[in-house]
């Protein structure tokens, strides 16, 4: 399913994708409660993606079972990920996600604005946008002295070509705390890029 862009993805120094679907098993579903077949993960791997972001508004579409199954399949596939975890102990061991590539050490963070009204149930963890948690994660990342801290934020409003006030304010705050790069997802359209 990635045949038309596989070459570009596989040639990237680091290919990060937003896994905005669960791998929750049958029955497979589309909008508004997504669940993809397991073969989708193999297609992602074959396309050359290195990292998947899992904190997004669809990560709980198949509930606790779907999220845990997705994590289990990601773990068995060898594709690294950030954003959702089976429990707090697993999150502490794996997060922030550190990547060493071409002589650079990168700390990767991932958060979502929400999960479409479905709450994560204990002991599962979804990285929601929460300044206290994010600040702790940034401090944890800084302690390991990365060359860059990238925050991948699932935020904003769908089909809006400009970031809203809340996105801009949070972006400013993230940069003030030491994040060096911010990548956004969720709007389903391309929003502007800004260099500071």
Regions found by a protein language model. Name each.
Residues 1-196:
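Acidic, metal/ion-coordinating pockets
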């Amino acid at each position: 399913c990635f045949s038309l862009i596989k070459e570009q993805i596989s040639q990237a120094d680091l290919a990060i994708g937003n896994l905005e679907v669960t791998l929750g098993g049958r029955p497979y579903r589309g909008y508004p409660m997504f669940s993809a077949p397991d073969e989708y993960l193999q297609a992602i791997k074959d396309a050359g993606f290195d990292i998947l972001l899992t904190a997004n508004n669809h990560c709980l579409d198949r509930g606790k079972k779907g999220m845990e199954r997705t994590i289990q399949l990601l773990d068995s596939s060898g594709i690294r990920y950030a954003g959702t975890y089976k429990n707090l102990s697993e999150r502490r061991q794996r997060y922030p996600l550190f990547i060493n590539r071409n002589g650079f050490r990168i700390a990767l963070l991932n958060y979502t604005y929400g999960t479409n009204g479905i709450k994560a149930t204990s002991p599962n963890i979804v990285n929601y946008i929460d300044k206290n948690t994010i600040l702790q994660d940034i401090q944890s990342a800084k302690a390991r002295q990365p060359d860059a801290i990238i925050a991948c934020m699932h935020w904003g409003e769908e089909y809006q070509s400009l970031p809203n006030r809340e996105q801009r304010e949070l972006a400013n705050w993230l940069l003030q705390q030491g994040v060096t790069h911010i990548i956004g997802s969720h709007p389903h359209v391309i929003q502007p890029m800004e260099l500071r």
